[in-house]
Amino acid sequence: MPRAPRTYSKTYSTPKRPYESSRLDAELKLAGEFGLKNKKEIYRISFQLSKIRRAARDLLTRDEKDPKRLFEGNALIRRLVRVGVLSEDKKKLDYVLALKVEDFLERRLQTQVYKLGLAKSVHHARVLITQRHIAVGKQIVNIPSFMVRLDSEKHIDFAPTSPFGGARPGRVARRNAARKAEASGEAADEADEADEE
């Protein structure tokens, strides 16, 4: 059976000036604050933001009663509010232009897990997510960059299959428990022998 050709498009764009020191410092600070793996994660979100802002700018050039502006503008705003990037009281295209990369980074699963107190740090949150300890609702999510919707935020918790979520302890914990039980069993045997003498 023939396969349809897939067209892939880039999900990020690199900066035009690679060694601009002010931008490098800002990116490093962002990567540290949000526990990002590399700069590409920042570039990906910048790329998404630039597409959203371009769409908003295009719609703002049209007349307020233009059906395209009404339909597409409301759809864009509704999508951003659902993700939690735009607040309920700022439902205007002008506010879309004021969005920053940090607003999107705040909505990542990695950041949300840390903010909810399930992890000790953002880096620990990333490890928990990639090791499949975190679930959103009933679905285990192992992608740290997963964008959490506002209505899903309250469903973030440890997965039922995770030792942190009350499931069977991990391999090392089981081994340590067995050793402890074995040691306490030996101590009890020695105590019995001492009593007999």
Swiss-Prot record:
Present with 106000 molecules/cell in log phase SD medium. There are 2 genes for uS4 in yeast. Residues 107-181 form the S4 RNA-binding domain. Component of the ribosome, a large ribonucleoprotein complex responsible for the synthesis of proteins in the cell. The small ribosomal subunit (SSU) binds messenger RNAs (mRNAs) and translates the encoded message by selecting cognate aminoacyl-transfer RNA (tRNA) molecules. The large subunit (LSU) contains the ribosomal catalytic site termed the peptidyl transferase center (PTC), which catalyzes the formation of peptide bonds, thereby polymerizing the amino acids delivered by tRNAs into a polypeptide chain. It comes from Saccharomyces cerevisiae (strain ATCC 204508 / S288c). CDD domains: S4. Belongs to the universal ribosomal protein uS4 family. The modification Phosphoserine is found at residue 184. Keywords: Cytoplasm, Isopeptide bond, Nucleus, Phosphoprotein, Ribonucleoprotein, Ribosomal protein, Ribosome biogenesis, RNA-binding, rRNA processing, rRNA-binding, Ubl conjugation. There is a cross-link at residue 180 (Glycyl lysine isopeptide (Lys-Gly) (interchain with G-Cter in ubiquitin)). It comes from the Eukaryota. This is Small ribosomal subunit protein uS4A. Its main location: cytoplasm. GO terms for molecular function: rRNA binding; structural constituent of ribosome. PROSITE patterns: RIBOSOMAL_S4, S4.
